Amino acid sequence: MIPVVALVGRPNVGKSTLFNRLTRTRDALVADFPGLTRDRKYGRAHLAGYEFIVVDTGGIDGTEEGIETRMAEQSLAAIEEADVVLFLTDARAGLTAADLAIAQHLRSREKTTFVVANKVDGIDADSACAEFWSLGLGEVYQMAAAQGRGVTNMIEYSLAPYAEAMGIVKQEDGDDDEEEREFTEEEAEAEQKRLQDLPIKLAIIGKPNVGKSTLTNRILGEERVVVYDEPGTTRDSIYIPMERQGREYVLIDTAGVRRRSKVHETVEKFSVIKTLKAVEDSNVVLLVIDAREGIAEQDLGLLGFVLNAGRALVIAVNKWDGIDQNVKDRVKTELDRRLGFIDFARIHFISALHGTGVGHLFESIEEAYDSATRRVSTSMLTRIMQMSQDDHQPPLVNGRRVKLKYAHAGGYNPPIVVVHGNQVKKLPDSYKRYMMNYFRRSLKVIGTPIQLRFQEGGNPFEGLNTKKLTVSQERRRKRMVGHIRDKNKD
């Protein structure tokens, strides 16, 4: 399971700066749910050989009045559900009453916590950080998030114990930037073979009360207990093995666990972190939407995270029975308008309560998974790449035409196509989108996003046949070239 790292601290200690650096800024806001998360942000990070979800909890300005009264409920939830807490302090401002209050709360929760003294650039760091040892949370790590100094080491120190305990293998590829990482055809082949031997992991997600539990029970064909009061039950999703028509699945049920803080509270408690972890651990995501409410901002936020995670996707519009035809037409129009950016995903209109349309979901789930894991040869990908060039040439960059040489598979689930050539890193985003759509149409990819990676370099097969032509072969070649030229003149 992918670890979750929560950034905690009072305002203006550098949490947002660290968050943007960890998530590389360009895809920092992968899941921002207005009205639900308030000042909390979620992002995917890859650093020091580890992949993890990072959560910016927002600032805590409470001091002597008590941490519980000043910390937002969502920030409390982030601490509860995080695997590792990074407690950021300001080395220049020194220890404050707010820092002491936060430390007291963290000690009471017994969370794995690391104290990080930020903004150590340009000062005597050791002297400035000495007082933070009095927080009683162990070693104090020095960092300058704005300059990036100490960030990688801090992540490695904080995640290594958790990774060792959970059996997570550190990636030793030496490159933490997904865009710069070398994707090899051999690795893709191994990944494709590995996926063929595993059951399909299906995550059922959606905002509260859209019918996820009802749909899960309908799929399983049995009633399941969905309310638990034992400590820790809100932490992780439930994994349910099942088999359907000879194919093995693992349902990742994010709605099967609820928490009742009060006896009369029956509304499902929505855990964003639990949902995001389920998405990361899945092969296919089934997003459930309430037909009566239409597309909500939370739905769009979840879709953003699914796309960034590269997971195959099927959409189920639930509670379709019993609504008027004019309402159905309005919902379909809204879906077309607001979900145009995921036109590759199948949309089903179902009733989980009565079972209408539920059986057809698995046809699309299998189709999406097969598209995400189907092996494609280098020759086919290179041919499609050449066809895309013939239809629309790459633009000029600094007066020179970008030259695309060959393409190969770089991974599966999601399908990754690696394009090699000269100046490919300078291709404009518009041409990259054109190529991505061209590959999607040509490969008939349904139900899964497709990713393109561009790498500088020549054809690996160049120079293999360096044997010099004989005199007779050279003469024959000249005659052939002359014949072709004469034919073209005619």
Swiss-Prot record:
Residues 374-458 form the KH-like domain. Belongs to the TRAFAC class TrmE-Era-EngA-EngB-Septin-like GTPase superfamily. EngA (Der) GTPase family. One of its GO terms (molecular function) is ribosome binding. GTP 1 binds at residues 9-16, 56-60, 118-121. GO terms for biological process: ribosome biogenesis. InterPro entries: G_ENGA, GTP-bd, GTPase_Der, KH_dom-like, KH_dom-like_a/b, P-loop_NTPase, Small_GTP-bd. PANTHER family: GTPASE DER. This is GTPase Der. It comes from the Bacteria. PROSITE patterns: G_ENGA. GTPase that plays an essential role in the late steps of ribosome biogenesis. GTP 2 binds at residues 206-213, 253-257, 318-321. Keywords: GTP-binding, Nucleotide-binding, Repeat, Ribosome biogenesis. Associates with the 50S ribosomal subunit. Residues 3-166, 200-373 form the EngA-type G domain. NCBIfam families: GTPase_EngA, small_GTP. The keyword Repeat applies. It comes from Shewanella halifaxensis (strain HAW-EB4).
